[in-house]
């Protein structure tokens, strides 16, 4: 089961009443959706939320949005592969390749598309950060980068060398762009090393980031 944790535990930021109400609702809804059926995923989601909040405070991103996006980022992970594909079709999400090749990337996009209808009071940047947490982008905002990185380095992740390297960058307060780059290219390297399908859009992002870093 997930460790007993709430967004209110050890928080360093003062949230207003409206924000507190929303965060309490999100946490309650997440528990209903996956605490019993997917306890590991539930614990991961809470851990990402906590890590994202800490990073947001360190990197001058919005901690409320970071918490909200962290809690919701894997909302559609409770769906089967087939259900994720069907939902992507329903929301006309098209990555330009057959769905079965990119199914692991769909859950962020489908959650962002559907949850904005459920939680209309959440800022637009929350949905973009959720949508981008699986694929990334060349023009990531600070919040986008925070969620992308937090998903990869949260404490429940095994301390493999690639994750440790990115964690150390955060601990040393490296530039957020460098932290994101580390997390992104380590992810690309993992896909290649394990001989999995590499989404062409990921290669485009990689090349754009490489060129941008050389400017």
What is each model feature region?
Residues 189-215:
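Charged phosphate-binding loop/patch that engages nucleotide di/tri-phosphates or the phosphate backbone
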Residues 3-37:
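Generic N-terminal amphipathic, Lys/Arg-enriched alpha-helix
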Residues 183-188:
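C-terminal beta-signal and terminal closure region of outer-membrane beta-barrel proteins
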Residues 28-35, 44, 53, 57-181:
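Divalent metal-dependent catalytic cores for phosphoryl transfer on phosphate-bearing substrates
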């Amino acid at each position: 089961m997930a460790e007993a944790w709430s967004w209110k535990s050890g928080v360093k930021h003062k949230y207003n009443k409206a924000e507190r109400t929303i965060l309490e609702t999100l946490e309650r809804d997440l528990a209903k959706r996956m605490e019993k059926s997917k306890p590991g995923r539930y614990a991961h989601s809470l851990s990402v939320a906590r890590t994202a909040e800490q990073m947001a405070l360190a990197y001058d991103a919005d901690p409320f949005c970071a918490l909200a996006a962290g809690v919701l980022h894997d909302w559609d992970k409770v769906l089967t592969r087939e259900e994720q594909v069907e939902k992507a079709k329903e929301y006309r999400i098209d990555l330009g390749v057959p769905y079965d090749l990119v199914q692991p990337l769909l859950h962020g996009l489908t959650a962002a598309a559907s949850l904005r209808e459920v939680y209309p009071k959440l800022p637009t940047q929350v949905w973009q950060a959720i949508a981008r947490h699986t694929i990334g982008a060349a023009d990531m905002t600070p919040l986008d980068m925070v969620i992308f990185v937090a998903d990869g380095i949260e404490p429940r992740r095994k301390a493999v060398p690639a994750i440790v390297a990115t964690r150390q960058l955060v601990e040393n307060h490296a530039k957020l762009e460098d932290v994101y780059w580390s997390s992104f290219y380590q992810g690309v390297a993992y896909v290649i090393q394990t001989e999995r399908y590499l989404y062409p859009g990921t290669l485009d992002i990689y090349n754009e980031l490489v060129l941008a870093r050389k400017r």
